Amino acid sequence: MTSNQLAQYIDHTALTAEKNEQDISTLCNEAIEHGFYSVCINSGYIPLAKEKLAGSNVKICTVVGFPLGANLTSVKAFETQEAIKAGANEIDMVINVGWIKSQKWDAVKQDIQAVFNACNGTPLKVILETCLLTKDEIVKACEICKEIGVAFVKTSTGFNKGGATVEDVALMKQTVGNIGVKASGGVRDTETALAMIKAGATRIGASAGIAIISGTQDTQSTY
């Protein structure tokens, strides 16, 4: 796989609280320069990213219910609508992990369905936070996502105790079939990214995108 091909797997990510306008501007410039698929940013920076990415092919991805997923469903749906109105091209929502742990599967499904409906055709990725789930819970969550028809299931926020693993990516891909799988959290070098893709990942979320495509190791990135 060439570096240009690998770049098209990457959502170039900056989600930590301290990121300032210059950081986001740099992120956008890097995404254009290296041909990344998208930038993944908090929704408050969508207008800035829209301005910086004008005329390019780079998409704007934003997060909803991030990073805990425990918001009211109505708030997630509203957040989604506002983000799309501002210019988001893709939505990454966090599943309600607490409801999964409470076995409230109907509520989990309704939560995702509400955001899916609010997307109104905008691609939706559902973050499972796999490090907190059992294998059975991962499968069940993936089955719900597949039934609803979301665009992707995603491993992690990158803000919890663990990120993507090859094992979890393979399990997710096996469960969802043709739906996309996004590996995120801890993917910081070419070898790891390629292992995730081999396991079934069709998108990589990373703040170390430049290191991934250049074959270097990034020890500074947090996502």
UniProtKB/Swiss-Prot annotation:
EC annotation from Swiss-Prot or TrEMBL: 4.1.2.4
Active site: D92 (proton donor/acceptor), K154 (schiff-base intermediate with acetaldehyde), K182 (proton donor/acceptor)
Enzyme class, first EC level, given as a word: lyase
One of the record's GO cellular component terms: cytoplasm
Record GO biological process: 2-deoxyribose 1-phosphate catabolic process; carbohydrate catabolic process; deoxyribonucleotide catabolic process
Keyword terms, alphabetized: Cytoplasm, Lyase, Schiff base
Keyword Ubl conjugation among record annotations: no
Subcellular location: Cytoplasm
UniProt cross-references to CDD domains, sorted A to Z: DeoC
Role summary: Catalyzes a reversible aldol reaction between acetaldehyde and D-glyceraldehyde 3-phosphate to generate 2-deoxy-D-ribose 5-phosphate.
Family the UniProt entry places it in: Belongs to the DeoC/FbaB aldolase family. DeoC type 1 subfamily.
Protein name, as recorded: Deoxyribose-phosphate aldolase
Organism placement in taxonomy: Bacteria, Pseudomonadati, Pseudomonadota, Gammaproteobacteria, Pasteurellales
